[in-house]
Curated annotation (Swiss-Prot):
GO terms for cellular component: cytosolic large ribosomal subunit. One of its GO terms (biological process) is translation. The lineage of its organism: Bacteria, Bacillati, Bacillota, Bacilli, Bacillales. This is Large ribosomal subunit protein uL22. Pfam families: Ribosomal_L22. InterPro entries: Ribosomal_uL22 (IPR001063), Ribosomal_uL22_bac/chlpt-type (IPR005727), Ribosomal_uL22_bac/org-type (IPR047867), Ribosomal_uL22_CS (IPR018260), Ribosomal_uL22_sf (IPR036394). Belongs to the universal ribosomal protein uL22 family. This protein binds specifically to 23S rRNA; its binding is stimulated by other ribosomal proteins, e.g. L4, L17, and L20. It is important during the early stages of 50S assembly. It makes multiple contacts with different domains of the 23S rRNA in the assembled 50S subunit and ribosome. SUPFAM superfamilies: Ribosomal protein L22. The keyword Cell membrane does not apply.
Length: 113
C-alpha cells in the first residue's frame, strides 16, 4: 500500500526544490525528517511539511505504521510561472519569472526481511 501527499503552486523554483528532494528519495521517513531539519535550504521546511502530510495520510487512511515507512517516490514538477517586470534604464523593462513547483511524495511500508 502507498500513501501520497502533493503540494501544488508552491512558490519556490523547481530547480532549487529538486536539490533537497534528491537528498531524501529512498530513505526511511525518520532519517528523511532528520536530513530536512539540518539542510539549510529554503525548500527544506516546505518539503518537510509535505512529508509529514504523507506520513499522516498513511497512518490515518491506510493504518500503516509510521516507523516502517520508506519514501518510494519523491519528485518536483514545474507549476505555473508568474511573470513580473523590473524597470531598467532608458524606459526599458526586463521580465522576471517567478517559478512555482508541484511537490509530490509517495511513502510505502518497508518490506519485511
Amino acid at each position: 500500500m502507498q500513501a501520497k501527499a502533493v503540494a501544488k503552486q508552491v512558490r519556490i523554483a523547481p530547480r532549487k526544490a529538486r536539490l533537497v528532494i534528491d537528498l531524501i528519495r529512498g530513505k526511511q521517513v525518520g532519517e528523511a525528517i532528520a536530513i530536512l531539519k539540518h539542510t539549510p535550504k529554503a525548500a527544506s521546511p516546505i518539503i518537510e511539511k509535505v512529508l509529514n502530510s504523507a506520513i499522516a495520510n498513511a497512518e490515518h487512511n491506510y493504518e500503516m505504521e509510521p516507523n516502517n515507512l520508506v519514501i518510494s517516490e519523491a519528485f518536483v514538477d514545474e507549476g505555473v510561472t508568474l511573470k513580473r517586470f523590473r524597470p531598467r534604464a532608458m524606459g526599458r523593462a526586463s521580465r522576471i519569472n517567478k517559478r512555482t513547483s508541484h511537490i509530490t511524495i509517495v511513502v510505502t511500508e518497508k518490506k519485511e526481511g
